């Protein structure tokens, strides 16, 4: 297991984890530029390929067990190779499987929502050839966000956020945030309180840095107070702002036939100024087998 993932999981055992963890700056991927390069036209910023993916936890019940789904997910992720993936529902062993399947260039940051390695993670995977983490934090969607495993709003499950501040090694070491979450499936009250807490935390981020929010929000875009709160926090929906879009499907399918034009409950949001070139809902399946009960959503971005 790569060292950074081990460090992340070891730190996740500490109750003080809600305090942001600063990581040492690595000089990997940096090189001195010739003096002449400073006089050249600035390079166009490379696109950042992002994904939000509810993995469906590693269940053992067929016909959609993790053992059956894993090779399909491996094929999908290797084919798409996003630079950053905000995941939901992954269990510890499952995340190690995905890390192996993505290959040696990927790492992840996360902690179990019940604390340590217990229960589901909001793990953020990233391509180390493109991104280096600078700082990360976990907090819980409750009245006591610094307490691992806390759940005070009557939600059906513990809910949390993992966020990471990255350096983009291909874009002049530019920094940006990724915030990843999974809101409650049972309680609208818990979802609304969670969205309000996320909005407050986002307001505390450096306003000069781009922000990408990934998540399963368990409500339809455009038709819920949760969506209004997130956009009221100064975010925009990449599905709406993208220059090009794929076909719309309900992003939760539950292994049933896909629903064209259905509810989009998995979103990728950004601060204004970031350009969304393309947004898509990925319908990949192999011989009728989907990798999850959700469809991953993707956005190709230029941070701004």
Residue ranges and their predicted role:
Residues 189, 203-211, 219-304:
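Metal-dependent phosphoester-hydrolase catalytic domains
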Residues 49-55, 73-98, 125, 164, ...:
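Active-site beta-strand/loop signature of hydrolases that rely on acidic residues for catalysis
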Residues 55-59, 90-94, 113-117, 130-131, ...:
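Solvent-exposed loop/turn segments at secondary-structure junctions
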Residues 46-49, 118-121, 158-162, 174-179, ...:
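Residues that flank catalytic or metal-binding motifs in active/ligand-binding sites
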Residues 64-65, 189-203:
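Alpha-helical scaffold elements lining the catalytic groove of polysaccharide deacetylases
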Residues 68, 72, 110, 148-150, ...:
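N-terminal post-signal-peptidase region of extra-cytosolic proteins
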Residues 2-9, 14-17, 21, 27-101, ...:
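N-terminal, active-site-proximal structural segment of metallo-dependent hydrolase catalytic domains
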Residues 84, 88-175:
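Structured beta-strand-rich core segments of catalytic domains in phosphoester-bond hydrolases
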């Amino acid at each position: 297991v790569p060292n950074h993932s081990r460090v992340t999981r070891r730190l996740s055992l500490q109750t003080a984890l809600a305090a942001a963890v600063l990581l040492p700056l690595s000089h990997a991927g940096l090189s001195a530029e010739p003096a002449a390069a400073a006089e050249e036209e600035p390079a166009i910023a490379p696109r950042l390929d992002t994904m939000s993916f509810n993995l469906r936890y590693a269940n053992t019940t067929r016909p959609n067990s993790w053992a059956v789904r894993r090779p399909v997910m491996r094929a999908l992720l290797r084919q798409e190779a996003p630079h950053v993936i905000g995941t939901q529902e992954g269990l510890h062993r499952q995340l190690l499987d995905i890390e192996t399947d993505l290959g040696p260039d990927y790492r992840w940051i996360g902690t179990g929502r019940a604390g340590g390695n217990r229960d589901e993670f909001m793990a953020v995977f990233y391509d180390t050839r493109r991104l280096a983490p600078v700082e990360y934090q976990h907090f819980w969607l409750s009245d006591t966000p610094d307490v691992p495993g806390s759940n005070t709003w009557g939600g059906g499950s513990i809910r949390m956020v993992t966020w990471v501040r990255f350096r983009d090694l291909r874009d002049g070491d530019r920094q940006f945030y990724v915030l990843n979450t999974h809101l409650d499936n049972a309680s609208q009250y818990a979802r609304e309180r969670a969205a309000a807490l996320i909005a407050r935390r986002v307001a505390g981020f450096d306003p000069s840095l781009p922000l990408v929010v990934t998540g399963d929000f368990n409500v339809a875009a455009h038709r819920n107070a949760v969506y209004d709160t997130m956009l009221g926090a100064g975010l925009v929906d990449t599905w709406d702002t993208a220059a090009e879009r794929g076909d719309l499907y309900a992003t939760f399918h539950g292994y049933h036939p896909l629903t064209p034009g259905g509810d989009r409950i998995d979103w990728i949001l950004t601060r204004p100024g970031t350009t969304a070139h393309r947004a898509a809902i990925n319908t990949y399946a192999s011989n009728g087998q989907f990798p999850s009960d959700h469809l991953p959503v993707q956005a190709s971005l230029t941070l701004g």
